[in-house]
């Protein structure tokens, strides 16, 4: 072929399952452990987003065996002009080997680019104004803690040029 058209949009994998309420056999991030973990004390560096935000959560090994836990941060953007999945993985971190009863605080960082989506009509990466929900868990469907922060006004994260714009129309799924 002389050309190949990529026709896969933003609703791929867990983004599709979570947004359209489809239960997969194993959700994104699913894993087994020989122990159990408890999440507590979610803290944001502020209630209003500036140029970045840190999110911390304490993870405690509540089982009888030592183990490690992967902490996943999902972000839900305001449902406004930009079509987005219900949540997207934006950061993750792994604990050290936690002994039974031991805790560790994991700190993750969100930057403006983590909030942005590309808006072709504006040739820019934009973070919409509004309330954003941070969800922390061990998989895309097993959320343990959540918190909300606000973006007071639209942020233009990066402006681009429209070079080699395609003349092929693409219809993506919509919520």
Show the residue positions of the predicted features.
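Secreted, periplasmic, or luminal enzymes acting at the cell surface/secretory milieu
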Residues: 1-68, 74-76, 100, 128-129, ...
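Detector for glycine-centered tight turns/loop "hinges" at secondary-structure junctions
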Residues: 63-64, 80, 123
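Short, hydrophobic/aromatic beta-strand segments
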Residues: 66-73, 85, 118-121
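Intrinsically disordered, low-complexity Pro/Gly/Ser/Thr-rich segments with frequent PxxP/GP/PP motifs
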Residues: 81-120
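Short, surface-exposed ligand- or partner-binding patches at beta-edge/loop junctions that are enriched
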Residues: 109-139
């Amino acid at each position: 072929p002389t050309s190949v058209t990529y026709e896969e949009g933003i609703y791929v994998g867990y983004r599709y399952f979570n947004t359209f309420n489809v239960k997969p056999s194993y959700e994104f991030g699913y894993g087994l452990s020989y122990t159990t973990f408890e999440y507590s004390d979610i803290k944001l560096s502020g209630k209003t987003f500036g140029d970045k935000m840190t999110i911390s959560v304490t993870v405690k090994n509540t089982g009888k065996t030592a183990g490690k836990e992967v902490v996943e941060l999902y972000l839900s953007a305001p449902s406004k002009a930009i079509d987005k999945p219900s949540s997207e993985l934006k950061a993750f971190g792994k604990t050290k080997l936690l002994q039974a009863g031991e805790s560790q605080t994991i700190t993750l960082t969100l930057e403006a680019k983590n909030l942005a989506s590309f808006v072709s009509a504006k040739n820019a990466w934009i973070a919409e104004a509004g309330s954003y929900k941070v969800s922390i868990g061990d998989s895309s469907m097993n959320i343990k803690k959540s918190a909300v922060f606000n973006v007071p006004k639209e942020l233009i994260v990066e402006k681009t040029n429209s070079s080699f714009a395609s003349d092929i129309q693409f219809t993506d799924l919509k919520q």
